[in-house]
């Protein structure tokens, strides 16, 4: 059951698609406080949700703020990342209630989940105008399903989007891109996508192509597509200020950009320097901006990634000028003391980026109402995704277009996926990737993944391999790195190349199961990844597991995420069949009883556990998804007590939007 409560005069967010009547009764489970709501947690209570946030699967023990942020350093001390996902799923503990809480509010929401008082959960919106949904059901899976129905079907990408994507900030020419494709082919490594960062643009301006570096983008796209590889270019939120650029000129002439208090366009700098920012909260602006993608779809482009759309701001001219003036004043001093150096010089420079004062200095038009940006800040990136998603429905009707974004809000999951932002090449970030996935998907973002190997810093060959051994299970599987870091395309690691090749081929072999699991999750509002406690709520050990995930109906994964480890502890809430896999054709199996185990797992092995009564369809590996044969399958299985094992498999053309036809489903029995 879903109950809806309204407070004040909420601004529209378009997060939900179901019309739930407003309830006049008391809010269940929660206690009203002066500035928000509270819930008293039992010692064994667990709090899931909040999507893209730091720390573990269980969010208890920390405080958070949903405030979409261009956060370059991912660490446990952070309060927010790129997405605002205000859904909590509370498992109250033995003999207590389970319920979901969705706070539909476009500004900051602050959470204290056992941080100040370990038995107290508190949350408060920055303004008194919001909607609150309370969801109850039979169990955690049922509550999750109801929430997903409330917010609408998750975005479904083309099937080729489940292949490997190779990306880097630093592919500067068409020949660089060709070389990546050539090396993958020569090293017999499967590949479906090459992502282009901002170097393909002319002067970092959206919807332009640098003709010297990429003289014929359409020909390059066609050349790679003939090899089964799609080009996936980036689009940033800031529109470069250039009166000669038709996108800038048209947006300015029609008043499509966000404005300052005096009505003039708001200006801030990002990669191209000074830029304007489209007012994505207006439908006509979304239609206009979405129309610009045609310049690239006309070149044969079928996929995009939207970036810098929190929106990230490097500086505003006004605050940069004030900073320079303060530095000029300091430069006249003979001695700059510690507080002045760290406070005014270092702090002043760092404070230019993503400054709260800048976010409070420009405005949107929301249904004819002028609204200051910081009040609706979290809607911005999601509405850029919406602009693109709605455009693709017009530009490529009946066809699927790949789209994923850095910034998001619940509701934008209907238009595109997300990647988990600018992580780092550390083992801690691998664990963070594992722990973030179920909560992100709980909030509707099914097509999700992290930058494999890590985006910043220099990765190591063993980290690249271990991360791939988890990444081969995530819907979005992309290797991405920043300019200046170690080159980390998989063919670069000579010593690890045989193992990396086998793991990439394993991903493609498992696609019949992974794609079927994804489509079931999207079409039936079930989960792709979920914590063990969802299926085993009465098992206290299962509820506490933070580093194993259930994958669909029939599989559990337990990645190795520590350096130099040759195995790991695994908890099985029921008997399962272990597949210790070195390649599609080289694996050991062992039936393990329920309980605690130490399982050996060499650096070139991955652990896959199949639950009783379930089977996993396995194809022959392929060089790209287009060459995958879904008809010649082997079944890996764990028969139940009756000796049977089965799976539901989904097959379609992978390109069109005809999802619901029943003939796409069939049952396979081992």
Residue spans of the language-model regions?
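Catalytic and substrate-binding clefts that recognize carbohydrates or anionic sugar/phosphate headgroups
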Residues: 1-161, 168-169, 174, 181-186, ...
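Glycine-rich, histidine-containing beta strand-loop boundary motifs that form or position
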Residues: 33, 41-43, 91, 102-105, ...
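Short, hydrophobic/amphipathic alpha-helical packing segments
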Residues: 64-65, 81-84, 178, 286, ...
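Catalytic core of carbohydrate-active enzymes
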Residues: 75, 379, 385-401, 407-418, ...
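A conserved hydrophobic secondary-structure block that centers on an alpha-helix together
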Residues: 77-78, 154-157, 167-215, 219-221
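Extracellular structured ligand-interaction cores
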Residues: 82-86, 96-98, 106, 129, ...
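A residue-level signal for conserved active-site and pocket-lining positions in enzyme catalytic cores
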Residues: 87, 143, 147, 184, ...
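Aromatic- and carboxylate-enriched substrate-binding clefts and catalytic-loop regions
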Residues: 190-500, 536
